[in-house]
Amino acid sequence: MIYISGPISKDPNYRLKFRAAAEQLKLRGYNVINPAELADVLPAEHLSHEEILFTCKHLILQCDALVTLPGWEQSLGCQREVGFAEGADLIVLPIEELLQN
C-alpha cells in the first residue's frame, strides 16, 4: 500500500494532481491511499490541521511506502508526513522515481 503526500493547503488544483498520481500508481498495480479524498468524508472545516494530520498518520501506518508529489518540500504538513513515515521505517521516495521503474 502506498500513501501519497503532496501539498494541499496552498494548491487549488491538488485534487487533480492527487487523482492523477493515484491513477498512475493503480495502473502499475499498487494499492493507494489518497489523502486528498479525505475531504470527501471528513468535515475539514470543523477539524484543525493537527486533527487531520493525526488521521493521516494512522493511514500512513497502514502503508509500506510513501511517495511525494512535486513541491512537498514547501509544505509543513508533507514534511511532517515524510518525517513520520521515515521514523516508521517506510520507504519514502518521489513519485517520479517509483514510476520510472
Locations of the language-model features?
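Conserved catalytic or regulatory cores that recognize and/or transform ribose-phosphate-containing ligands
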Residues: 1-101
